[in-house]
UniProtKB/Swiss-Prot annotation:
The keyword Hydrolase does not apply. It comes from Digitalis purpurea (Common foxglove). The keyword Oxidoreductase applies. Residues 1-2 form a propeptide. GO terms for molecular function: magnesium ion binding; monooxygenase activity; ribulose-bisphosphate carboxylase activity. Its cofactor is Mg(2+). Belongs to the RuBisCO large chain family. Type I subfamily. Substrate binds at N123, T173, K177, R295, H327, S379. HAMAP family: RuBisCO_L_type1. Keywords: Acetylation, Calvin cycle, Carbon dioxide fixation, Chloroplast, Disulfide bond, Lyase, Magnesium, Metal-binding, Methylation, Monooxygenase, Oxidoreductase, Photorespiration, Photosynthesis, Plastid. Mg(2+) binds at K201, D203, E204. This is Ribulose bisphosphate carboxylase large chain. It is found in: Plastid, Chloroplast. The gene is rbcL.
Length: 477
């Protein structure tokens, strides 16, 4: 270790303020397999060198503070401190740098996403020496991954539970999201499920409001599930949102869902919190419930390119905390999401081993050592004309979720569900025959319209609906 960066408590305590880079900028450091590695996009204040800014991030997110303290001598800072070990300028940005920081594993409580984030993205984001700060990616070491249960069941177990293979799953968010009575809500679910969807969904802000209390909703949705299963011979589900004001109330709702015998429940993991989410994921594994995760509030955290936390980090955190599905954007719909960035974190959700690939925004190689995978959910402003692109982009291990794209059908919910199911089956059949969905997608849908009046009506309604807005968060060139 460089004499400049070694913490020498033995020479005695010397009060005062010293530059962070003297202790926390260590370009000669060789990272360990057990280190948690972080890539930060740092925008220093004018006059602050990048080395000082990177070192400040490492210090303030580990053992450092603004001044020397005598209690430094009571421990080994060299063992516990974070280290900024590499800095690179961001192409095309005069004042932005990617600063790489290594954290020793001993800094983190086992199995706690809450503790990991409290350390890495805690006070440092308000640090005055930085104009902006964004956590772009984390490398979670194998030793830390193994302290997490992860998703309650994972992709293969879900397929086996549902007995559905070889195609994406279809879902629908019930609209209007607020204001329906429980009985009318259940009726809407039933119509969608009997029409051919695999799932219906509570919207993220449906909890237990005066117009529809949670217990009533659970009962009517369970009735819809069982009735549609009896009619279609397929296993159906509804994402019953168990999110609540307290963990105790959340668990009470999860227990009631299990007693009803439904296959899946739901949680808003960012607004509900990682501690609550991990507890719920453990309960779901122990009791055979699938867990659908909504990412409400994510864009507050991840949308701005130079400040916040990138969604690929939030996706990794969810895989550790636990969830069988998570919303991932659509690339083609109404919500933010560049194709290569989206496919990068979709791989981080589903695959077991993901190589570093900066062209898709992946800063580190990640080994999940067989932690179960998470199914990405494409949802937001999509309709039947998007089906070929969605099937091509997301593949079989995904949920394609059409809210307005089902309920907005001119003939009603069930025909809307039929249209989506026919479009999906046509795309899967064409893909399996070797046709190019990206090039022939519209033709495939038009061919299917000839033998499905429901699909033809849907195509007519949404033939001119597009969302042509550039993504805010794009890859560095």
């Amino acid at each position: 270790m460089s004499p400049q960066t070694e913490t020498k408590a033995s020479v005695g305590f010397k009060a005062g303020v010293k530059e962070y880079k003297l202790t926390y900028y260590t370009p000669e450091y060789e990272t360990k397999d057990t280190d948690i590695l972080a890539a930060f996009r740092v925008t220093p204040q004018p006059g602050v060198p990048p080395e000082e800014a990177g070192a400040a991030v490492a210090a303030e997110s580990s053992t450092g503070t603004w001044t020397t303290v005598w209690t430094d001598g009571l421990t080994s800072l060299d063992r516990y401190k974070g280290r900024c070990y590499h800095i690179e300028p961001v192409p095309g940005e005069a004042d932005q740098y990617i600063c790489y920081v290594a954290y020793p594993l001993d800094l983190f409580e086992e199995g706690s996403v809450t503790n990991m984030f409290t350390s890495i993205v805690g006070n440092v984001f308000g640090f005055k020496a930085l104009r902006a700060l964004r956590l772009e990616d984390l490398r979670i070491p194998v030793a830390y991954v193994k302290t997490f249960q992860g998703p309650p069941h994972g992709i293969q177990v879900e397929r086996d539970k549902l007995n559905k293979y070889g195609r994406p799953l279809l879902g629908c968010t019930i609209k209007p999201k607020l204001g329906l009575s429980a009985k009318n809500y259940g009726r809407a679910c039933y119509e969608c499920l009997r029409g051919g969807l695999d799932f219906t969904k509570d919207d993220e802000n449906v909890n237990s409001q005066p117009f529809m209390r949670w217990r009533d909703r659970f009962l009517f949705c369970a009735e819809a599930i069982y009735k549609s299963q009896a009619e279609t011979g397929e296993i159906k589900g509804h994402y019953l949102n168990a999110t609540a004001g307290t963990c105790e109330e959340m668990m009470k709702r999860a227990v009631f869902a299990r007693e009803l015998g439904v296959p899946i429940i739901m949680h808003d993991y960012l607004t509900g919190g990682f501690t609550a989410n991990t507890s719920l994921a453990h309960y779901c594994r122990d009791n055979g419930l699938l867990l659908h995760i909504h990412r409400a509030m994510h864009a507050v955290i991840d949308r701005q390119k130079n400040h916040g936390i990138h969604f690929r980090v939030l996706a990794k955190a969810l895989r550790m905390s636990g969830g069988d599905h998570i919303h991932s954007g659509t690339v083609v719909g109404k919500l933010e999401g560049e194709r290569e960035i989206t496919l990068g974190f979709v791989d981080l959700l589903r695959d077991d081993f993901i190589e570093k690939d900066r062209s898709r925004g992946i800063y580190f190689t990640q080994d999940w050592v067989s932690l179960p995978g998470v199914i990405p959910v494409a949802s937001g402003g999509i309709h039947v004309w998007h089906m070929p692109a969605l099937t091509e982009i997301f593949g079989d291990d995904s949920v394609l979720q059409f809210g307005g794209g089902t309920l907005g059908h001119p003939w009603g919910n069930a025909p809307g569900a039929v249209a989506n199911r026919v479009a999906l089956e046509a795309c899967v059949k064409a893909r399996n025959e070797g046709r190019d969905l990206a090039q022939e997608g519209n033709e495939i849908i038009r061919e299917a319209c000839k033998w499905s009046p429901e699909l033809a009506a849907a195509c007519e309604v949404w033939k001119e609906i597009v969302f042509n807005f550039a993504a805010v968060d794009v890859l560095d060139k």
